[in-house]
Amino acid sequence: MNLEKPKWPDGKKCAAMLTINLNAELFWLQIDPSCKDMPKTLSLGQYGMTRGVDRILSILKERGIKATFFTPGWVAEQYPDKLKKIKEEGHEIASLAYKHENMALLTEEEQEEAMKKGIEAIQNVCGVTPVGFRAPEGELTLDTLRIAKKYGMHYSSNLCDDDRPYQKDLENGETLLEIPIHWDNYDLPYFAFNYHPAF
């Protein structure tokens, strides 16, 4: 284990990455497809797009902070005006596949299709090509990371094995920058695992 103090650019003391997973109602639909008939449950995701995005953007602007919005391609297609606003305000739009697929359960070909469709949707809506990738709920395989690299991703933000960025060995002679995440810093576990039977 390397316990040396990291050397950050410009003599900075530390680095942090603020990320938002912009799943909208898609998160709920992927957990349980029957949610399509549950307006209250769907409204939890729709609220983020109706009010949450604008409020987050306002706070970020007020504080002078830039963030990364990991976005499924489907969400970009459903909410193009929100995605364009995020881009116009100078935030990064990164890929969260196409339709919140559990990449670990897909074949390599299916993963590639989800990656490709997600990237193309963001390109079509925003005119930018994402360079960062997060698998929905971090469910992925080593093949997923190789596919991300193949499709031009500069980094992944999925794994929880460090608190510093590092080069992840893809076991094929290549590496991909990993910017680790930590579930204890997410709001999702406190929220998502309590939606049944109340809704």
Annotated model-derived regions:
Residues M1-G132, E137-Y186:
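Catalytic alpha-helical scaffold of carbohydrate-active enzymes acting on polysaccharides/glycoconjugates
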Residues H182-F199:
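Catalytic grooves of carbohydrate-active enzymes
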